[in-house]
């Protein structure tokens, strides 16, 4: 069984016992969180597609940790001017483990 949830402006295909990184959520590590924006729920027999969300379904997950991703370098180079600017960015994320899918 799998589901497609919406979190942080992105859509994620999730299954039970799967861990994934989402955009940073304001939840402490070790707590449980419920995603009610479920776009699709599928098992071996049938598929439920929401318009836009599947009613009465939710995905439960446990927050494992918070962290920051790998550094991305941003370089702005101005030709013939002997000038360049470099910057870096590390995006915050929340790592969650899916515990249940209720359809």
UniProtKB/Swiss-Prot annotation:
GO CC list: cytoplasm; ribonucleoprotein complex; ribosome
Description of how the protein assembles with itself and partners: Part of the 50S ribosomal subunit. Contacts protein L20.
The protein's name in its UniProt record: Large ribosomal subunit protein bL21
Keyword annotations: Ribonucleoprotein, Ribosomal protein, RNA-binding, rRNA-binding
Source species, domain of life: Bacteria
InterPro entries in alphabetical order: bL21-like, bL21-like_sf, Ribosomal_bL21, Ribosomal_bL21_CS
GO biological process, one term: translation
Species the sequence originates in: Psychromonas ingrahamii (strain DSM 17664 / CCUG 51855 / 37)
GO MF annotation, one: rRNA binding
Function: This protein binds to 23S rRNA in the presence of protein L20.
Matching Pfam families: Ribosomal_L21p
Assigned protein family: Belongs to the bacterial ribosomal protein bL21 family.
Keyword presence, Secreted: no
